[in-house]
Amino acid sequence: MEKVYEELDEVKAVNEKLRIDYRNKTELLENLKKVQNEQLIEIREARLVNEKHGFEIEEKSREIAELKRANEELQRCLREKDSVVKRVNDVNDKLRANGEDKYREFEEEKRNMMSGLDEASEKNIDLEQKNNVYRAEIEGLKGLLAVAETKRIEAEKTVKGMKEMRGRDDVVVKMEEEKSQVEEKLKWKKEQFKHLEEAYEKLKNLFKDSKKEWEEEKSKLLDEIYSLQTKLDSVTRISEDLQKKLQMCNGALTQEETRRKHLEIQVSEFKAKYEDAFAECQDARTQLDDLAGKRDWEVAELRQTLSMKDAYFKEMKYENGKLEQENRELLGSLKELQEATIQGSGNSALSKLKNKFRNLENIHKNCSANLRSKEAEWSSQVEKMVEEINDYKLQLQSKEAALKEVELELENCRSSTAKMRLQYEEISIMFLVLSRTVSEAQSRLANAKDKQIKDEKREGNCYSLLMEQLDQKNAALAKAQMEIKEERESVACLLKRIEMLDLFENQNIQMQKEVERFKEMVEESSRFQTQMQEKMKEAENDYEEKLLQVCDALDNTNIDLVAEREKVVSLTRQIESLGTVKEKNLVMEKETQEYKEMLEESEKCRVLLEEQISQLESDSNENIRELCSKVDIAYAKLAEEVEKTASLVRKSESIDLNEEHRQRELDHYKEMLEESTKTQLLLQEKVVDVENDSKRKLADVSEALEIANSELSDKTSEVFQIEFQLWVWKSIAKRLKAELEQNQNLRKRVEASLLEQVGVGEAIKQEKNELVHKLKVISHARSSDSEKKESLMRDKDEMLESLQREVELLEQDSLRRELEDVVLAHMIGERELQNEREICALQQKDQDLCEVKHELEGSLKSVSLLLQQKQNEVNMLRKTWEKLTARQILTAVETESKKMMIIELEGEISSLSQKLETSNESVSCFRQEATKSRAELETKQTELKEVTTQMQEKLRTSEAEKTELVKEVASLSTEKRNLLSFISEMEDGMLKLYDGDTKLMKTLERVTQCCDGFGKENNNGETIGSPRLAMKHEEDVVTEDRSPFRPLNH
């Protein structure tokens, strides 16, 4: 007993130790719970950090909205600049008004010059009056000469009288002397008169020459004035255009400078944002490093705890072994005691030990049941954990793929940022070059303006010189030499002026070339700016999308971390419940190993995340570069789109034509349907008429049969002939039945073939739909793959898809119509074949009846009356056959003996009634078919209405699209026209300048020719002088020649 008590004490001591171990394990579990709580706190802090990142992203989105607002403000600034441009246009209008005032002043000067020309013409009129006076004087001299001649005649008469009266020689001598003197005077006066006439003719010729020269000079001067005015107008217009262009260039340069400044600001903002994002990434990396360090520390603590648990587990195993051995020893000792001491004083102690033993057995039994239940629970939990682990592995793989994509995008973003920096540097260089070129252009324009002012002053001086020249020419019509000198001076001035104008035109041409070059530079810069804006927008969108993706990835990782930590919490709880169970310890070991692997994988994922972030930065740069290249490709595609718009316009026109053709076809089909409905109505009316006629004819046939029965009772000798006729009719009926069966078989075959064709058509439609679906799937896949590349082509792809759908619908409609046409054609063909066959059968019957008639007429003359009656009956039946359209078979007239003929006729009447029933059934079938056809027609009409409405809607949409395309084409055509008008204006200006140059050259050639002519005349002795000097010279010559008459004049 003492040994049992000692053993019990030892068991108690072992139990106390186990309790102490349990307490220690509970403390360790509480520590693990605290660690888990700390981890949860860290996770919450990480969530807060993520929320902060989300707020920062929202702030960035707000900043983007502010940038958009800034963009709108820039657009407002552009509008204000447009208003400024309008004001500048108003100023230009004012300048034009000033130019018009100057033009009016020039017109006033022109009028003054014309008044000077009028004064010169008045002087010419005075000279003409003087010439008339000289002519009157010459006529007076001629009268004096006539008077002198009369006096001479009278003197001669007196001399003759004196001679007659006086015969003195002295008087005769005197008279002769006087006569000789008078004759000499007369000769001298005649010579003088001749000289005067010659001088007068010379003066006339000189006056005419001077008048012609004056008119020529006047016309030349007027031409020069007009040419100079046109040149001035063209020069003023060119100068105004250049000023406008310069103002536009200055405005564009200011706009470009403002844009450049805004772009620099945006670049700086983007740099700051990039630096902030980079700093945030670095912070995230540091946080990840801190988290990794904490995880390493936690893993080390977990490993320590696991090692401690392993040691405790081994101790527990050892203690359990000891306890089992002790239990066995106790059981053996108890059995010995039960055998040894059945009776004695140890009964009470044995009863106590038995009770304790029983309690221990119950406890062991309960422990085994609990262990089995827990083993089942843990096996199910292990399976669930394995499934969850597989799921988490798949999630980790998907996240790794997503992280790789994010890394690629970051690399693209980095490459694109590098490209953007290079492009911004190129833009800055371009702006510097443009600023320098603009400054040079402004300096050149200032010099050109100074030259223009000088040229205007010179032109004013030239106008004053021209006025002086006109005054001098008007005052010096009698002084040709002075005019020649002045003309030479004017020629020299004109030559100088022409040289200056040539220089001015060359300068203008150079300035135009420079302006065009500046225009091209401005256009290129504007295009480049638009490209850069689009690229910046696309880069912003990509950056936002990538940030969203990164945020989503971070959220997913945080969720995964939370799930993992929750799993850790559940595992710690499970560890609490798995205190002393071996299987639970094994499961814990497996789970710890798995979690070690998970931690290692998480560390790998963290490393991969860091690598992916670096790759994403590089991908972002590459994406920006690719976007730049894509934008260039898009601008290249814009030209193709313009061509495509033209082709679409052409296609729209062709579609309009096709739609008109289809509308016509629809109208034609509608007419066909109306005609078919009308034909069906007519057929129904005919069927009703046929029924009525058949009833009437049946009544007539019954009456005729009664008459035939009454008449055939007396005539039995004709039975065999009538039996022959009946046999013929039976053969004909069999033939008709065979033909009907053939027709029905043919109809069934045709219907089967039509159904097969319909099935084939539906299969083709299904295949087409499947192909269309596949094409749509492929197009969607391609569009999803190339959304970034072909964002501009989506609208046109949708247009093409809608056009394809319309084409498919039209094809389906055409197939339906073709099938309907085929069905109608088959039905009509069947009816026509049936009609033809019935007609042929009736014709054959007619022929057979005619043959029978001839045979009966040849063989039986006595029965002619009956045959005639039966022929009439046969004719009536033939008419009924023609009207029933191959659905009714008439029976022939049967004649037998009285009883046999009556029986056969009753059988024929029954057969006729059955056939009438069949005909009624066929009529009812026809009616049903007619109703079905009506229903089908109504459905088809509804379908046609729906199709027409759809086509009208499509036509409306196509018309709207057509109007939009026409508007776009009109806008493009207007732009083209504006460009062509601008080019034509430039060409007109150049042509005007060229015409002015040619006119000036012509005037110079004329002036030089005139100068050469005047020089030659002066070199030839200055024969063309003033008329007065010539007269004086001639008078001196005459006086010198007539020197002997000087003493006689005294």
UniProtKB/Swiss-Prot annotation:
Classification via InterPro entries:
At4g38062-like
- Keywords of this entry: Coiled coil
Query: Coiled-coil stretches, from where to where?
Result: 1-420, 463-627, 692-981
**Name of the protein:** Uncharacterized protein At4g38062
Organism expressing this protein natively: Arabidopsis thaliana (Mouse-ear cress)
